[in-house]
Regions:
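Conserved phosphate-binding elements of NTP-dependent enzyme cores
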Residues: 1-927
């Protein structure tokens, strides 16, 4: 490859990279793959992105640089041909409670512009459109009447400068006006005696309808006079033979029904601006108030059965009794579960009726009595974030929702799923003038909506909070935003964009990546998904194994150059030389935990059985309700049953089944095992306790009086006090990246010299922490330390033999963190029967890692545990004993159980997308 058509990296040595040379073709779709821990992210993010970003920042002025982060140069000999780099990672990009899907994709900004430019304001009183009128509108109204129809031009009497009506009329007479219309009758001004309650207008002119030029000119003059005298208002009263007079009101002000409305502008629709934000919640949509979920935690109960928890007990129960006694007259159903009540029935319960007082009245009484301690405690117990009573969660002041486009206000649009929003804009009809104004705005909106659909996010709504998105969703929104920004000549680096994406949507994602590349960008993707690897223009495989045994380029080239018998695990799996085998049989099951009536978010009252002592996989397209069912309902409800935890589960009717067969439930996520640099795998799995005891048992340690605690780098004693057991000292630099220097006292060894003199077979405590898990197992096996080997073995079993015992947990990937936790549970041999729940455990895992992960799952099940996994990866799904497939689509069109049973049974279900893709995995064709 020529230098100007490729990015050339020479001698990359970041983390475990072994002085590698890589050439990456520019303006292509490039996939970097390899085992977990092989060095993919070190190449993509710590080398490529770090250097691309650093060079871009260095090209800016020193003034601009002071506002940007300090960037250090990655460890490599040189990098050539690198464009400005943009990283799109699996991180929830915004913790800002105001940030939504709409604002982060810029669709909401364009919606604001659309409503400001072509929105029509409608009066909440009459529903008529609010307009500003001109003399031309008045002439147009007159021309609609037959020739010769009599009419009058009137103006309301405006009292200026604190005058009385009599004083104003005298001034009008001096200006040449002679008549008034009083309560519909004509009268001379000098004959009128003002009375309270009279409707009085100043007569400007009396005319007959005519299309003649002189008549139109006269009306125009009279209308302008009326608007001047009437402070912008003018009235026409037409007198038709045989009918009552018709009155038309015109105004140069933006008003209707006696209300002056605000003219639409883009700030009016911004909840981040004081001009548009709801004055009560200040644009958050929620306020601290009485939380419905705390007052009615179990929505499957009726009012009669005690749904309202604050009305339990003898004294407060009087309020419940009041509702029961008045319910028949009020037409309120006291035996209906709360979740089945209509909006009107819920309003009756909260706001009360003439026959009983509601929950709001109860809490008003509590507030009035909060000088008593028991009432203060009660009020605090039921307070929480609740929907704003003024804007009802729209975040905008009411005036913003008087404006409509295509019959809908902006709050209704942001509540629609993206799929329905697309239909709305596809069918939007505007008049030619408005269509011309809105053409460019609609183009931007439609293209961004299409990008969101292309990355499989059609189930989201624009008002969904950014901080409630999963890492995969957040990354794909950033990807859609990048496409919308249409940058050219950049380097995009993505970290597993297929996370959380069903196989059905992978083709769309590949199409989006291609679009980004075809704009003229280089797209580098760290990925394990087989379809995306096969779709790439160029593949770089880092390996052959992980950690110290990785960091080399084992393959670079395109799909057609793949060779058999390669050192690359990726190549072997792609060519079918290695596979993840199907289990020989599916485990049978009789015991289960059952959830009934799950209806949180988009779940449609589903019933699901989670078998015990087998591996259950919950599948479905993005947004179908998997996480809601498993994490929000099943996990929290089960935890509440077993541990009496306070975390509120989502809405469901009941949990039952063989609960007596379980003792614990564990949710194993990918969060770091410890946030400090001191936390490491060997301490997490409790193996370091045994290692410290072994060193404390050595003759020199006993002679010096060193206890096991002396060999800890977390407490004073044997650790180096200069660096507090860190091994490094961080020097903060003002305008440069912080310097991390090796501690001069211990030379990076974390312990005092006398501590390091204690040795076990020529190895001191620092030497052991520097060993990989594989090396440590070999060392301790040779010297008969079975206890320590037994503790370390699970780390090797889950495929983490390459990590150092003392490696800081902050340097582990999400997948590695999850497997360290899994190793900890595998090490608990005598643990009580536990339900383990995993959320996409294959994130960041190569085919070869998945094989080891499945072996670890089998080991847990053999020990009497049960496993439930939320997963899209078909290699895991095909190995399940039981599959629960949710769908059929995401969002409102999901939330149902489409199929359950063994993978073979699900594959036969025509309505299941998962089933369609499973057929190929269960009956693979030759590669």
């Amino acid at each position: 490859m020529a230098e100007n058509t490729s990015i050339i990296i020479k001698g990359a040595r970041v983390n475990n990279l072994k002085n590698i040379d890589v050439e990456i073709p520019r303006n292509k779709l490039v996939v970097i793959t390899g085992l977990s821990g092989s060095g993919k992210s070190s190449l993509a993010f710590d080398t490529l992105y770090a250097e691309g970003q650093r060079r871009y920042v260095e090209s800016l002025s020193s003034y601009a640089r002071q506002f940007l982060g300090r960037m250090s140069k990655p460890e490599c000999d040189f990098i050539k041909g690198i464009p400005p780099a943009i990283a799109i990672e699996q991180k929830v990009s915004s913790r800002n409670p105001r940030s939504t899907v709409g604002t982060s994709t810029e669709i909401y900004e364009y919606l604001r512009l659309l409503y400001a430019r072509v929105g029509k304001t409608f009066s909440p009183v009459s529903g008529q459109e609010v307009k500003k009128h001109s003399a031309e509108d008045i002439v147009k109204c007159m021309l609609e009447y037959p020739e010769g129809t009599r009419y009058t031009v009137l103006a309301p009497i405006v009292l200026r400068e604190d005058r009385t009506l009599q004083q104003q009329l005298e001034i009008d007479m001096k200006q040449g006006f002679t008549r008034l219309e009083v309560n519909g009758e004509m009268m001379r001004i000098d004959e009128y005696k003002p009375k309270e309650g009279d409707t009085v207008f100043l007569l400007i002119d009396r005319m007959t309808a005519s299309s003649e030029k002189d008549s139109v000119s006269r009306l125009t003059d009279s209308a302008e006079t009326a608007m001047y005298e009437g402070d912008g208002a003018c009235l026409l009263r037409f007198y038709q033979s045989g009918g009552s007079p018709c009155l038309y009101r015109f105004s140069t002000k933006f008003e209707a029904d006696g209300i002056i409305f605000e003219e639409p502008n883009d700030q009016m629709f911004s909840f981040n601006s004081p001009i548009g934000a709801c004055p009560v919640c200040e644009g958050f949509g929620k306020v601290i108030g009485i939380d419905e979920h705390l007052v009615i935690p179990d929505r499957s109960l009726s009012v009669y059965d005690g749904a309202v928890v604050c009305w339990r007990g003898e004294k407060m129960g009087e309020w419940r009794d009041m509702v029961i006694h008045g319910a028949e007259k009020a037409g309120f159903p006291i035996f209906t579960p709360y979740y089945e009540l209509t909006d009107e029935q819920r309003r009756m319960l909260w706001e009360g009726t003439p026959y009983f007082e509601g929950i709001n009245a109860f809490f008003k009484m509590v507030q009035e009595n909060q000088y008593k301690i028991q009432y203060r405690v009660m009020l605090a117990r039921y307070r929480g974030k609740t929907l704003c009573p003024k804007c009802h969660g729209t975040r905008l002041k009411p005036e913003a929702n008087y404006v409509r486009v295509g019959g809908r206000n902006i709050s209704e649009l942001v509540d629609l799923p993206i799929t329905e929003l697309k239909l709305f804009f596809d069918n939007l009809q505007l008049d030619p003038h408005d269509a011309d104004i809105a053409r460019r705005i609609l183009t931007e909106i439609n293209s961004r909506i299409q990008f969101l659909l292309d990355v499989g996010l059609g189930y989201l709504t624009l008002n969904r909070l950014s901080n409630s998105l999963s890492g995969g969703e957040s990354q794909r929104i950033n990807l859609a935003t990048s496409l919308g920004s249409s940058l050219v000549g950049s380097l995009y680096i993505l970290d597993e964009p297929s996370i959380g994406l069903h196989s059905r949507d992978t083709d769309k994602l590949i199409h989006v990546l291609r679009q980004l590349q075809q704009l003229g960008n280089t797209v580098v993707v760290v990925e394990h998904d087989e379809e995306i690897i096969r779709a790439a223009d160029y593949i770089i495989d880092i390996g052959p194994r992980a950690g110290r045994l990785g960091g080399k380029v084992v393959y670079q080239g395109d799909m057609k150059d793949l060779q058999k018998d390669s050192d690359s695990y990726t190549v072997r799996y792609l060519l079918g030389e290695e596979t993840i085998p199907l289990p020989e049989h599916r485990r049978p099951w009789n015991n289960y935990i059952e959830i009934k009536g799950a209806r949180e978010n988009n779940l449609k009252g589903v019933e699901a059985r989670f078998p015990l002592n087998v591996m259950t996989v919950v599948t479905g397209v993005s947004g179908s309700g998997k996480s809601t069912l498993v994490r929000d309902i099943f996990y929290r409800a089960l935890k509440r049953e077993l541990d009496e935890c306070n975390e509120r589960p989502g809405e469901f009717t009941s949990i039952g089944g063989d609960l007596q067969n379980l003792r614990n439930v564990e949710f194993v996520d990918q969060n770091p095992i410890g946030k400090s640099s001191r936390s490491n795998p060997v301490t997490y799995i409790k193996a370091y306790d045994e290692i410290r005891k072994l060193w404390a048992d050595q003759p020199l340690a006993k002679q010096m009086g060193y206890s096991a605690g002396y060999f800890s780098f977390n407490s004073e004693g044997g650790r180096c006090e200069e660096c507090k057991g860190e091994g490094t000292i961080t020097v903060e630099m003002q305008f440069m990246a912080d310097l991390v220097l090796e501690c001069e006292s211990c030379h990076g060894k974390r312990f005092k010299a006398d501590t390091l003199e204690v040795k076990f077979h020529d190895m001191n405590i620092y030497d052991v922490l520097e060993m990989t898990v594989n090396q440590a197992i070999e060392f301790f096996t040779q010297h008969g330390q079975k206890k320590i080997v037994k503790k370390l073995q699970p780390l090797q079993d889950v495929g983490l033999g390459y990590i150092k015992l003392g490696q800081a947990s902050s340097t582990l990937s999400g997948g590695e963190n999850q497997r360290v936790k899994l190793a900890f549970y595998l090490s608990q041999e005598k643990a009580d029967p536990t339900m383990f729940i995993f959320d996409e455990p294959t994130t960041g895992l190569h085919f070869h890692d998945i094989k080891k992960l499945l072996e670890a799952f089998d080991a847990l099940i053999r020990r009497g545990h049960s496993i439930v996994i939320i997963e899209h990866n078909l290699d895991v799904v095909k190995c399940a004993d039981h599959v629960i497939d949710l769908g059929p689509e995401g969002g409102d069109k999901g939330g149902n159980i489409v199929a359950t049973g063994t993978p073979e049974e699900v594959a036969k279900c025509a309505a299941s997308y998962t089933g369609q893709f499973l057929q190929e995995k269960l009956h693979p064709s030759l590669p």
